[in-house]
């Protein structure tokens, strides 16, 4: 099984952070802020963040039998998106926690279409609003002073509220993603601040091939030229607990 290069690098970084993080900060003991906050059975908070939505398109070389046109598509750019949500964590043990994170993702993707026969170009901007409910397992290293690194892994089911408004190419509303990442609990005097970076990889084909909504048959060529589409995300999140 071939491992995605981004996943490989993130796994190595997570392992290094989890195993070596405390040693980097082990010069001296300091007074601990919020020393008993991790003893609570349930933890709650909120978060804001930024993300980068990636759309991978797989062209199939389809040629229109009527015109001889052959189109290829590429997601050439994606704007920086915004994320906001709430955090609920159930403490399973001293090092394990189960997290549920109802989230709203707002983002934009841009697709360029190119006709290989005529060199004609076309484009589509896809604005998306996702309601997601990630469920993650959190594995934390022992706390040292006011620093505690951790890694997470889980799944993220989501629904795109705006998929019905997409024109040339449309994606399915439901998507399921695998996510993994790393972060660090930083214990402040009155709250816990948690920066986290994670990578999300789509597990299914989100290309909608059933375009009964199209009234112009010539617009179907963009969908016919693609076999499948998958989505990925890099998410930088700041939690406040």
What kind of feature is each model-predicted range?
Residues 26-80, 239-241:
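Short glycine/proline- and aromatic-enriched beta-strand/turn motifs that initiate or cap beta-hairpins
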Residues 58-75, 108-129, 161-171, 207-226:
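Flexible, solvent-exposed loop segments that connect beta-strands
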Residues 51-55, 105-109, 156-162, 200-206:
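Structural signature of outer-membrane beta-barrel domains
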């Amino acid at each position: 099984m071939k491992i995605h290069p981004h996943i490989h690098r993130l796994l190595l970084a997570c392992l290094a952070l989890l195993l070596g993080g405390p040693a980097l900060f082990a010069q001296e003991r300091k007074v601990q802020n919020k020393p008993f906050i991790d003893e609570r059975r349930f933890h709650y908070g909120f978060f804001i963040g930024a993300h980068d939505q990636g759309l991978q398109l797989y062209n199939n070389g389809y040629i229109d039998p009527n015109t001889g046109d052959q189109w290829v598509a590429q997601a050439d750019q994606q704007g920086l998106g915004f994320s906001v949500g709430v955090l609920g964590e159930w403490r399973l043990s001293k090092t394990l926690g189960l997290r549920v994170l109802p989230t709203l993702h707002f983002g934009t993707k841009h697709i360029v279409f190119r006709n290989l026969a005529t060199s004609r170009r076309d484009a589509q901007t896809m604005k998306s609003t996702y309601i997601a409910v990630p469920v993650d397992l959190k594995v934390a290293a022992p706390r040292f002073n006011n620093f505690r690194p951790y890694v997470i892994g889980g799944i993220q089911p989501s629904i795109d509220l705006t998929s019905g408004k997409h024109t040339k190419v449309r994606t399915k509303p439901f998507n399921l993603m695998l996510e993994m990442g790393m972060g660090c609990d930083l214990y402040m005097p009155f709250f816990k601040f948690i920066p986290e970076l994670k990578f999300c990889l789509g597990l299914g084909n989100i290309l909608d091939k059933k375009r009964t909504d199209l009234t112009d048959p010539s617009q179907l060529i963009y969908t016919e030229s693609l076999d499948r589409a998958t989505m990925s995300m890099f998410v930088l999140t700041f939690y406040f607990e």
